């Protein structure tokens, strides 16, 4: 259906990663669809999936990565490290950056859950991702958020790490017919869950899509709660 991909390691997160609110907001490139448009924008920072705490459906969108000029600084730093320290660093998954995806946290103490990620993100080794066809992404998201998936992953990976290779082993029933009513019902429910999770995430001031405190939404006309 789709190949789980391990994300990149910058080799120096303190240098190349920032919380989105630590940088100039107008210098963040949101919603880019491909590397060419991102390069032509001359922007420096781009959304970055880095895993984070256990959360299903949507969220954990906190970081941006320095990907100006198609990651020029990161790539040069990698070359320097490889030459001076004989390290084997890599910038993986570049063919899929900025694509709509499903992402998850590499480390989790007890639970597993994936999150829908819209276009515009790069991704970390701690936030590995899957890039299915658009027509399958909601259905696959629901399966990966199910208890069935958790049971299988606890068998495949008894540790606290959920690697891309573990997800490759998951069995899934997948209809080839787009008119399948069960699949359509699942996709509708999945979208509802994503919408609910997004609304909750964006109600926090730590979200870059935050607009208004939840308490203010309940003010009566006279300005009291």
Predicted regions mapped to residue ranges:
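S-adenosyl-L-methionine
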Residues: 1-58, 62-225
């Amino acid at each position: 259906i789709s190949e789980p991909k391990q994300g990149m390691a910058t080799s120096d997160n303190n240098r190349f990663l920032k919380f989105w609110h630590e940088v100039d907001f107008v210098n963040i490139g949101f919603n880019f669809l491909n590397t060419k448009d991102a390069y032509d924008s001359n922007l420096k920072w781009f959304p970055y999936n880095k895993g984070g705490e256990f959360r299903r459906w949507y969220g954990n969108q906190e970081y941006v990565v320095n990907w100006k000029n198609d990651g020029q600084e990161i790539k040069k730093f990698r070359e320097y490290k490889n030459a001076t320290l004989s390290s084997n660093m890599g910038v993986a998954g570049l063919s899929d950056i900025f694509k709509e995806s499903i992402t998850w946290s590499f480390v989790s103490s007890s639970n597993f859950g994936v999150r829908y990620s819209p276009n515009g993100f790069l991704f970390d080794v701690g936030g590995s991702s899957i890039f299915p066809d658009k027509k399958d992404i909601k259905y696959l998201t629901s399966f990966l958020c199910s208890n069935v998936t958790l049971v299988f992953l606890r068998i495949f990976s008894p540790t606290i790490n959920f690697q891309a290779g573990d997800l490759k082993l998951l069995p899934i029933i997948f209809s080839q017919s787009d008119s399948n009513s069960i699949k359509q019902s699942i996709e509708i429910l999945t979208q509802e869950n994503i919408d609910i999770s997004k609304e909750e995430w964006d109600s926090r001031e730590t979200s870059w899509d935050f607009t208004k405190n939840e308490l203010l939404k309940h003010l009566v006309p006279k300005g009291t709660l």
